[in-house]
Amino acid sequence: EKGNPFFDKIAQNIYLGAVRDGFLTAMPAILFSSVFILAASIPEIFGIVLPATVSDWLWKVYNYSMGVVGLLVAATTARCLAESMNRRMPKNKVINTTSVMLASIVGFMLLAVSNVDGGISTTYLGTKGLLASFVSAFITVNMYKFCVIKDVTIHMPKEVPGTISQMFRDVFPFSFSVLVCVLIDVACR
């Protein structure tokens, strides 16, 4: 009972809530991949050797679902945080959750991925990259919030269709979010 006020305060923190909800949103991919790691690993425990093509296929499914969970969590955490912030925003001020997800993915890629000969390193796309996914999500949503509140956007005439107008409104927040991630990447590498 003594700790209830402390835990209530933690439960109301929108950043921790976004991390929780972001993980829960990504849970289907995590559970799906778990089936394939079990199918690939359990036979080996009993001395059963799966054919190479079957084993490769099982590990491929696992690697392309659980192996990109950091990328998924970057997007889902950003969306959940943006939705939470939208509930606290002034009227007529809304953060575009789809654009925030895309910017968070780009920011995550900049923070977590390194170039290697002929491609990119996938080492931090999975669970090893979760810190980068949270950093990317938090930066992105806060940059969007700043730009939306301060009206740092490109305004289009009313005759322009809503989707096109929204795309132009998101140019500056997207750009600033990605640039901040670039600066962090440059400073940390």
Predicted segments, located by residue:
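Signature of multi-pass transmembrane helix bundles
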Residues: 1-30, 46-189
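Hydrophobic alpha-helical transmembrane segments of multi-pass membrane transport/permease proteins
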Residues: 31-35, 39
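Glycine/proline-enriched, intrinsically flexible loops and inter-domain linkers
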Residues: 41-45
